[in-house]
Amino acid sequence: MQTLDHDHVSVHIDAPPEAVYELIADVTRTPEFSPEILRCTWLDGATGPAVGARFEAVNKVSRGPSWKNRPVVTAAQPGREFAFSRTEKFSGTLVWRYRLEPGGSGTRLTESYEVIRPISRLGWFIIDRLFGCHDRRAELRAGMDQTLQRIRETAERDITPGHTPPKTATTA
């Protein structure tokens, strides 16, 4: 049986932390970056990142059907940190976190996950058989690498010096 506990990946981005934060905290843009996310929409009147805000994510791996989950934002500190927790039936609870640190000519961005409640045996069976994910840890790490590279490319292409990010929205 597979195990999953935590992992992280980092990248340097030539853009200010506040501007990078605006990219990652706008969950509606997540499909541009993540190879597993098809769609994200804010729920319950939320229009942007705020602690307690919920959103619906539609995920899909290369094999198997898509599925929905409803994460809750647990940290929303512009220019510093964006995090959310998601619980799925049989698949435990994971906290996904983006930490931003000023560094050199830009930002060191770290994406990580931590398993808070482990995936059940039935969950691993489903992951292995239905989705064909025989090494979920490696797939998640590869996905984080790809996500961070896409964020870096977007930030370095679209964000100019002196950029002033828009104000962060709150829940309704």
Language-model segments: residues:
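Charged phosphate-binding loop/patch that engages nucleotide di/tri-phosphates or the phosphate backbone
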Residues: 148-166
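Short, surface-exposed coil-to-beta transition loops
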Residues: 6-8, 66-70, 92-96
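Short, cysteine-centered beta-strand-loop-beta hairpins and adjacent loop/turn segments enriched
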Residues: 61-67, 117-122
